[in-house]
UniProtKB/Swiss-Prot annotation:
UniProt EC number: 6.1.1.10
GO molecular function: ATP binding; metal ion binding; methionine-tRNA ligase activity; tRNA binding
Family: Belongs to the class-I aminoacyl-tRNA synthetase family. MetG type 1 subfamily.
Binding site for ATP: 333
First-level EC class: ligase
Family matches, as CDD domains: Anticodon_Ia_Met (cd07957), MetRS_core (cd00814), tRNA_bind_EcMetRS_like (cd02800)
InterPro entries membership: aa-tRNA-synth_I_CS (IPR001412), Anticodon_Met (IPR041872), Met-tRNA-synth_bsu_C (IPR004495), Met-tRNA_ligase_1 (IPR023458), Met-tRNA_synth (IPR014758), Methionyl/Leucyl_tRNA_Synth (IPR015413), MetRS_core (IPR033911), MetRS_Zn (IPR029038)
Protein's name according to its UniProt entry: Methionine--tRNA ligase
GO cellular component: a single term: cytosol
Required cofactor(s): Zn(2+)
PROSITE patterns to which the protein is assigned, alphabetical: AA_TRNA_LIGASE_I, TRBD
Lineage summary: Bacteria, Pseudomonadati, Pseudomonadota, Gammaproteobacteria, Thiotrichales
Major location category of this protein: cytoplasm
Cofactor note: Binds 1 zinc ion per subunit.
Length: 680
């Protein structure tokens, strides 16, 4: 086609330290649908990805398993690619950041930035594990928060009060690797001076390359000033040594996005594609990154600046998506909703999930929810009950009554109905293009309803029993099969395996937007075989049960401080009843909850305690969405001295259990409790 586009698409690189789960698959399914759609439209499109295979966690896990990091990442890569293939994620090339191509481009970009004085050297103080003889990343240090005195907090921020700080500010710090008390040591680190690119980034972020919500968030970061980015790590470290340096390695987040270039370069070397055509500064090709909203800082600031500084093109757009919840809550190991890709594939058809995600996804960064009950109902209703049902209702008559051949002649009304389906093609194509998949699915299902209404009205099962109705029957079932062909073509980016089966049934060479303009007339089809079966609730239950068992078998995903006995907090020192009686616990109703933009972990709560309202800042953002909290009852400390924070005055504290992060659980009183009641 004359307006053929050249498009390169990437997904964020999965970390080579664990298995793929359904939360990961939101992104890969979203991207794969878009790539398949572009190819169906006749564009020259390439979809590449790779394992993110460097960093301290990989080094430590390999040590724990007694193997080399290279062996670990090779095994994980094979597991990842098996999972992706199971869900029909069709990469044109899948690579690793631990590759010669990635080493070349990471070193080249660094050298270009250094020659232009965008790299600086600074002496910093860092915690050092004297037992392991290694500098400790922030997340590998735990201790007591210097602000709220909560124990077992990470080295960069407190999940209880939301405070951010330097690891050296922690009280009673411990190495999460060995449990030893770390010592402070000076070390030289290399920094990328991001502020040198502030003007360029301010312009780039407001040229339509980002979603509006993301661009607005970046404005907040611009207001607070762009800080230099530490791009080096000290040995021992699994990664690439920095050119011209001894025992200094590229931080994993420097070479991770470079993996997009490396994977495409490997594809170019394999197929003869021109790498420079897609990556040179004045390239007219298109480059798109699909990522989660949690890594936007690296992709929308550091990455464009690195590319620009090194003389490469910047992305046409970065598409961010939200997170996945299951049954309205975070994925849970105890409930069996933290579901691994392999576990899902052991029990359910991957096309079910591809369709369900498509029916939920749009171009915004909102989180999406996998309601397991709705999942079964929607797949059974839409795919099985509407789309596949059209073919099964008509195909038998074509085979038995008309030797498997579709009719040659159509009435004007039949042609008009068919054309109404074709007239929707550009609307649906535009929705795919804009990543408004949910709306596209609604448009397609509205057409499916229309097709089923036609079959109901013409009632071929009745016509088949009446003499002299052969022509009407022939048109009814032939048009029904043609309408099915249009629908399955529109759905092909979402359910490719089902589309392939339908293609074989229809005996057509391709399914694409152009071919459906011409209906199948006087065309032979094969005998119909079931294209998809219903979702059974029993299969879902078996999957969640298996997921609970999976969690018991899995090694820890994050390092924990070694403890002699238990991971539970020890029982605190004994107090008297009089001490306890001083604390005034009250039932509180959450009447409002909102984000605190300046804080990573805090939610601002307005609490009704019966005798008035209180404002409390709670460090529960990692575990709850504000809109899910409104109307809930909880327990608060009502007589805690108000504490002035930079976000406002906190007039108490709500009670929650759990170690922190996603594992936080607000206390909820039993039914009958009322705001203001004292807990005693």
């Amino acid at each position: 086609m004359s307006n053929t586009r050249k498009i390169l698409i990437t997904s964020a690189l999965p970390y080579a330290n664990g298995p793929i789960h359904l939360g990961h698959l939101v992104e890969y399914i979203q991207t794969d649908i878009w790539a398949r759609f572009q190819k169906m439209r006749g564009h020259e499109c390439y979809y590449v990805c790779a394992d993110d295979a460097h960093g301290t966690p990989i080094m430590l896990r390999a040590q724990a398993e007694g193997i080399d990091p290279e062996d670990l990442i090779a095994r994980i890569s094979e597991e990842h690619q098996t999972d992706f293939a199971g869900f029909n994620i069709n990469f044109d090339f899948y690579h690793s950041t631990n590759s010669p191509e990635n080493k070349h481009f990471a070193s080249y970009i660094y050298t270009q930035l250094k020659e232009q004085n965008h790299i600086s050297r600074k002496t910093i103080k860092q915690f050092y594990d004297p037992e392991k003889k290694m500098f400790l990343p922030d997340r590998f240090i735990k201790g007591t928060c210097p602000k709220c005195k909560t124990d077992d907090q990470y080295g960069d921020n407190c999940e209880a009060c939301g405070a951010t700080y330097s690891p050296t500010d922690l009280l009673n710090p411990k190495s999460a690797v060995s449990g030893a008390t770390p010592i402070e040591k000076e070390t030289d680190h290399l920094f990328f001076e991001l502020s040198h690119f502030e003007d360029m980034l301010k312009e780039w972020t407001h040229q339509g390359h980002l979603q509006t919500q993301i661009a607005n968030k970046l404005d907040e970061w611009f207001e607070s000033g762009l800080r230099a980015w530490d791009i080096s790590r000290d040995a021992p470290y699994f990664g690439f040594e920095i050119p011209g340096e001894k025992d200094k390695f590229f931080y994993v987040w420097l070479d991770a996005p470079v993996g997009y270039m490396a994977s495409f370069k490997a594809l170019c070397d394999k197929t003869g594609l021109d790498f420079d055509e897609f990556w040179k500064a004045d390239s007219t090709t298109e480059l798109y990154h699909f990522i989660g909203k949690d890594i936007i800082y690296f992709h929308a600031l550091f990455w464009p600046a690195m590319l620009s500084g090194a003389g490469f093109r910047t992305p046409n757009a970065i598409f961010s998506h939200g997170f996945l919840t299951v049954d309205g809550q975070k994925m849970s190991k105890s409930r069996g909703t933290f579901i691994m890709a392999k576990t899902y594939l052991d029990h359910l058809n991957p096309e079910y999930l591809r369709y369900y995600f498509a029916a939920k996804l749009n171009s915004r960064i909102d989180d999406i929810d996998l309601s397991l009950e709705d999942f079964a109902q929607r797949v059974n209703s839409d795919l099985v009950g509407k789309v596949v049902n059209i073919a099964s209702r008509c195909a038998g008559f074509v085979s038995k009554k008309f030797d498997g051949k579709l009719s040659q002649a159509w009435s004007d009304s039949a042609s008009t109905l068919y054309q109404s389906f074709i007239d929707k093609s550009e609307t649906i194509a535009n929705l795919y293009e804009q990543r408004e998949y949910a709306q596209a699915m609604r448009e397609i299902m509205a057409l499916a309803d229309k097709a089923n209404e036609y079959i109901d009205e013409t009632a071929p099962w009745v016509l088949a029993k009446q003499e002299g109705k052969e022509a009407e029957l022939y048109e009814s079932v032939s048009l029904g099969i043609n309408l099915f062909r249009v629908l399955i073509t529109y759905l092909a980016p979402v359910i490719p395996t089902t589309a392939e089966k339908a293609q074989a049934f229809l005996q057509v060479d391709t399914l694409n937007w152009t071919d459906i303009n011409t209906p199948l007339k006087d065309h032979e089809i094969t005998k119909f075989k079931a294209l998809m079966t219903r979702v059974e609730i029993e299969s879902i239950e078996k999957m969640t049960d298996a997921s609970k068992q999976d969690m018991k078998k899995m090694p820890p995903m994050k390092p924990e401080i070694k403890e002699e006995a238990s991971n539970l907090d020890p029982i605190a020192d004994e107090i008297t009843f009089d001490d306890f009686a001083k604390v005034d616990f009250r039932i509180a109703k959450i009447v409002n909850a909102e984000q605190v933009p300046e804080a990573d972990k805090l939610i601002k709560l307005t609490l009704d305690i019966g005798v008035g309202e209180r404002q409390v800042f709670a460090g529960i953002k990692s575990a709850y969405k504000p809109e899910d909290l409104v109307g809930k009852l909880t327990v608060m400390v009502a007589n805690l001295k108000p504490r002035k924070m930079r976000f406002g005055l906190s007039e108490g504290m709500v009670l929650a259990a759990g170690p922190g992060g996603k594992d936080l659980f607000l206390l909820n009183p039993d039914d009958g409790a009322q705001p203001g009641m004292r807990v005693k």
